[in-house]
């Protein structure tokens, strides 16, 4: 049998996410919520039997639907030991810590709730940290892994941390801590991943002898990122960037399974952040 018009990736996704976060004690946050999705095929699915093959049994055919509904309660625990802060009136302003920030994000899809059609579990761990070395020199690193487990019927890989838009908190730019050249299809192609990111920031790395032409550059950055998942072992990204009062820019080179992957550039404005 060959799949006809219905490609499971060509679906409209109607979704609703809700989460409420409470700080239990200084540096310890717990968030509770849920997510609901209704994914409908852009075109209805059909199977076309080719050759002398018999029609698949009903229990096999029932696994393929035009509409998939999921409902999943979610809990997120985030901890930053030794977090410094100050109070601005009644508002608490978090500053920094000499220890990393740890987070665990767990979600469980429940079959039958609001007509949901499948079960799954998603768990992700994330660690991120900034090490201040003085004289505007900083090291940033981030490490994380995640997996979908205990899935029943077809499910959709939709990680919370492993996303192009899930930026680390407190870093001096919006480039480090995520992948910049990685093809978007990889974010939803595997049920597990392990990744790491490293950034070194300093005022003078490569441009120290060009100060006449680069006096507006505040700092330079070296980026190194790595990712491991099935069929991509490993993915590597190396980049170089500069930061000014107004913008940040970075250039990246990638490698997939030890072969050249591509070259990319990221440009962000920082006009209202500095």
For each feature predicted by the language model, list its residue ranges.
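Single conserved hydrophobic/aromatic residue that forms the stacking wall/gate
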Residues: 1-5, 9
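Residues on the lipid-exposed face of transmembrane beta-strands in outer-membrane beta-barrel proteins
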Residues: 16-24, 34, 73-81, 125-129, ...
């Amino acid at each position: 049998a060959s799949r006809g018009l219905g490609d499971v990736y060509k679906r409209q996704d109607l979704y609703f996410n809700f989460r409420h976060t409470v700080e239990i004690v200084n540096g310890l946050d717990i968030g509770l919520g849920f997510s609901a999705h209704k994914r409908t095929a852009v075109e209805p699915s059909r199977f076309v039997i080719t050759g002398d093959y018999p029609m698949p049994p009903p229990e096999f055919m029932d696994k393929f639907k035009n509409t998939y509904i999921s409902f999943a309660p979610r809990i997120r625990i985030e901890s930053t030991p030794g977090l410094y802060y100050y109070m601005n009136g009644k508002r608490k302003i978090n500053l920094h810590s000499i220890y990393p920030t740890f987070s665990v994000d767990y979600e469980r899809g429940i079959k039958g709730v609001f007509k949901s059609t499948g079960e799954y579990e998603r768990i992700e761990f994330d660690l991120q940290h900034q090490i201040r070395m003085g004289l505007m020199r900083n090291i940033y690193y981030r490490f994380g892994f995640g997996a979908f487990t205990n899935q029943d019927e077809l499910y959709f890989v939709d990680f919370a941390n492993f996303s192009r838009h899930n930026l680390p908190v407190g870093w001096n730019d919006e480039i480090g801590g995520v992948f910049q050249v990685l093809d978007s299809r990889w974010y939803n192609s595997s049920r597990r991943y392990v990744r790491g990111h490293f950034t070194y920031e300093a005022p003078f790395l490569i441009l120290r002898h060009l100060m006449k032409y680069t006096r507006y550059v505040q700092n330079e950055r070296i980026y190194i990122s790595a990712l491991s998942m099935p069929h991509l072992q490993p993915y590597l990204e190396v980049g170089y960037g500069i930061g000014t009062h107004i913008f940040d820019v970075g250039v990246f080179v990638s490698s997939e399974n030890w072969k050249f992957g591509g070259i990319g550039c990221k440009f962000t404005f920082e006009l209202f952040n500095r």
